[in-house]
Design a protein with these regions (language model features):
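Short, charged helix-capping/linker segments at alpha-helix termini
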Residues: 13-23, 34-53, 176-177
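Internal acidic/polar
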Residues: 2-7, 85, 91-115, 120
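Sigma70-family region 2
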Residues: 13-14, 40-42, 53-70, 89-91, ...
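Short, Lys/Arg-enriched C-terminal cap helix and immediately downstream tail that follows
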Residues: 88, 165-177
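Short helix-capping/turn signature of helix-turn-helix
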Residues: 27-30, 38-40, 134-141, 151
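Structural recognition of an alpha-helix C-terminal capping motif at a helix-to-coil junction
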Residues: 49-56, 69-81
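Helix-turn-helix DNA-binding module
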Residues: 120-131, 139-156, 167
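Arg/Lys-rich amphipathic alpha helix in sigma70-family domain 2
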Residues: 60-67, 77-97, 163
């Protein structure tokens, strides 16, 4: 029987079980890296570095997890904060080097060209819309969970997702012609 995130968290907090934390990292590493890749526009090395920093901070601050939201929501919040701090240091919060955009080809995606176009379109969205769309549409967070991660009002998240999706549709339609 596989342990839940809550069970693993209890083992980490109560017993200091590093293997339990390793399992949490294994479970959540891919979604966290995916979010960070979208935020840094597919710079794989930077996304990996930020993901590592995210998990280091999560481990150091695990006792501050109050359980008011899912563990993944708490982790996404840490990842977003790590991204913002890095961007501030690099003075790139608004514009990140476009030439770094790389297409990820998912072997399970029937049309790799479509995935490439979607990643390019996502990269062209403003950061606030790209982040909201990535959290809600790609990572499956509810609007409420995304609002907690981003520390913005629920209505703002809904607006950012709606506008981002509309812009994506327009960009993809324009590229198809």
């Amino acid at each position: 029987m596989e342990l839940t995130d809550a069970d693993l968290l209890a083992r980490v907090i109560v017993d200091g079980d590093q293997h339990a934390f390793g399992e949490l990292v294994r479970r959540h590493q891919s979604p966290v890296r995916g979010l960070l890749r979208q935020l840094v526009r597919a710079d794989l090395e930077l996304a990996d570095d930020l993901a590592q920093e995210t998990f280091i901070r999560a481990y150091k601050n695990i006792r501050s997890f109050r359980g008011e939201a899912k563990f993944s929501t708490w982790l996404y919040r840490i990842a977003y904060n790590v991204f913002r701090e890095n961007a501030r240091k690099r003075k790139e919060l608004v514009g990140i080097d476009e030439e770094r955009l790389q297409a990820e080809v998912d072997p399970q995606t029937p049309d790799p060209g479509l995935r490439h176009d979607l990643m390019n379109a996502l990269a062209n969205l403003p950061l606030h819309e790209r982040t909201a769309v990535t959290l809600c549409c790609q990572n499956g967070l509810s609007h409420d969970e995304a609002a907690r991660v981003l520390d913005i009002p629920l209505g703002t998240v809904k607006t950012n997702v709606l506008r981002g999706r509309e812009k994506l549709k327009k960009m993809l339609a324009a590229w198809a012609t």
